[in-house]
Amino acid sequence: LFLLASTYDQDMHANPNNPKATNGTDAAWGGNRARPDLVKKFFPNGNVPNLESYATAEAAGDDRALFCGVNRTLDNEDVSTFKSGFGVAKFTNFKTDGSAGHDATFPDADFFLMRAAEAYLNFAEADARLHGDQTTEEGTAAINAIRKRAHASTREDKGYSLSDICDEWSREFYFEGRRR
């Protein structure tokens, strides 16, 4: 429940099929928010829109950009105000088809210990470290697999640097307790 309730308030709507729903639970505590640097990983040109989370992902061209910017500032200038900073809509109690979970008080959401994306990023990072700060074709394919799943653009003509991989870790694992 913490990951769902702490990152939402009653003004956030993560489900376009049910505009009255917030996060699929009956709790929205309005606490944790994204730092500007994280949001800008999805908008490197700095032009970050103030949209609902599902629309932000579409604007970023990356399904992982689940940030609510409606009536919020990008910067976290006042840490005691939830509208100071973008809300994070990464975790919900909605099923993949958009329907609600079984219980709004006790979420159905499972918490993962290891994801395929972690293995792919570990492989790509090791590949780049072995090959002078640039992925080979195999390392590039590993990152492209993650980005294709997120409907984000991929690279075919050149590989990824360690800096690119670090940014990819951020985009994939934010709010999951993993390193950047």
Which residue ranges define each predicted feature?
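Surface-exposed charge patches in extracellular/virion surface proteins
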Residues: 64, 72, 83, 95, ...
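Elongated scaffold/linker segments in the mid-to-C-terminal portions of large proteins
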Residues: 1-122, 127-129
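Extended, hydrophobic/aromatic-rich amphipathic alpha-helical segments that build helical scaffolds
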Residues: 1-2, 62, 110-146, 162-176
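C-terminal capping/lid segments that line or modulate ligand- or cofactor-binding pockets
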Residues: 5-8, 151-158, 166-180
